[in-house]
Regions:
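AAA+ P-loop NTPase catalytic core and its hallmark functional loops
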Residues: 1-181
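Conserved AAA+ ATPase small/helical "lid" subdomain
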Residues: 166-205
């Protein structure tokens, strides 16, 4: 059942098509997709803004802190209202780059699918993605507590799979011919004394 689904964590180098895979799945299933890069989020935008609410317990009134709806969840509900599509994927990219102040809330979100009192809508699943630390200086390694809350899938570049995709996308034959002969050039990242030199799968399309 969707409500029991552990969030997926697609883990692999940059530019190999993690986002494209999620978008293709959503398209083929005819479901919605809302994408966010977590590097762009502060604690306030992810969790919502605090405000004071008056509540009554018995005969007494008290002021308590509440939070507005998370910008992330609000986008999902907005998508449903706009399209009428109540099933979809909430895709959170660069999930292992969240700030230290946001990490505890993200840990809770991965387990309970909620920010504060606001939950991910029924019918929506969470898919996340991230890069290994050697490719991104902002990455924070996941500990056991976090990994226990997600279903980790290692994603690697595969030229033969990409070649089939490239033919369907009408990638120029000269590019495919070149890579047939020079497969070592398909995906390459190298740190030189001067700068980082790289070519990724994304760069060939």
């Amino acid at each position: 059942p969707v409500e029991k689904q552990r969030p997926l964590f697609l883990y692999g180098p940059p530019g190999i098509g993690k986002t494209a895979v999620v978008e293709q799945i959503a398209d083929e299933l005819g479901i919605g997709i809302v994408s966010y890069s977590m590097t762009h989020h502060t604690r306030q935008s992810a969790l919502g803004l605090p405000y004071i609410k008056t509540v009554k317990f018995g005969d007494e009134e008290y002021q308590i802190s509440e939070f507005t709806m998370s910008e992330i969840l609000a986008s999902v509900y907005g998508y449903i209202e706009e399209t009428g599509n109540d099933k979809g994927i909430l895709f959170l990219d660069e999930i292992n780059c969240v700030s230290e102040t946001l990490s505890p809330s993200m840990l809770r979100f991965l387990q309970y699918k909620s920010f504060g009192s606001h939950k991910v809508p029924d019918g929506w699943v969470i898919v996340t993605a991230g890069n290994p630390p050697e490719y991104n200086k902002s990455v924070r390694e996941y500990d056991i507590a976090t990994l226990d809350r997600v279903q980790k899938i290692d994603v690697e570049s595969d030229y033969d799979v990409w070649r089939e995709y490239a033919l369907k996308r009408n990638v120029h034959p000269a590019i495919i011919l070149y890579l047939d002969v020079n497969r070592q050039s398909f995906y390459h990242i190298e740190n030189t004394p001067v700068r980082m030199v790289f070519v990724t799968v994304r760069g060939w399309v």
